[in-house]
Amino acid sequence: MLKKCTKYISMILIALCLFPWIQVEASSTMTVRNQEELKSALENSNISTIVLGNDIETTEKINVMRPVTIDGNGHTMQYVGTFGDSDSSDNTIWSGIYVLQVYKTEATIRNIALTGGNGGLLINGAKVQLEGTIDLSGNGFGGIELGQGSGVESIAHVILTDQTTLVNRTDSEDRPTLWVPKDSTGSILEINGAQYELLPEEEFTLNEIEAFTISTENPETGDQIILYISGMFLCFSVALFAFYKLSKREKDYFL
């Protein structure tokens, strides 16, 4: 009887210990459906993952200033505010409007479309990993700016993996998918673990970014040639040594 009671008490204690952790896990993810809910979730440090429950329209730049994951869940964030002093809806009027800005922190952004701004995403002295499909179409000046604003000492760092797909149907030389402004000290583009240092005023279309991706998947470098030659030399050396030992053994046999 005592053993049975002890068993039940142990089960209850385990359940009580697990309960708070279950509660924390449940509260760390929030689904948002409008601009105000999104801003509120970004201000709540207990929320580690923000999921878009539907497409969201914004009238201001949305700032990410703490570590967080934003899961677009296949939805769109669209800036529908105005540009310039004339309150124009023309996003080719430069007003420094980005649909989303990640400022001096680390964040993960996945499966989202960012459209309607001067730029889709500003990585301002931050480190951002992009996952899934990131659609940057429909922005007036381009997709992603790797910037370093006034007073920001850290450089922008964007991470792409083999699970990242960039989409930009309005990509062009004048509206690149990725760029570094001239007032920056440079930035880092990381693709599948390989890091590339980008210089101020460098701009990259979608095809040029894809060229980086291809080079990391199929590197045609001098290192490969050296490795090939080294391998051939090793094989030749082993064969020569084996031939020498065999010849010596036959010579000793006849002697």
Q: Which ranges hold each PLM region?
A:
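Bacterial N-terminal signal peptides
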Residues: S10-P20, S237
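Acidic Gly/Asp/Thr-rich repetitive segments characteristic of extracellular carbohydrate-active
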Residues: S27-G53
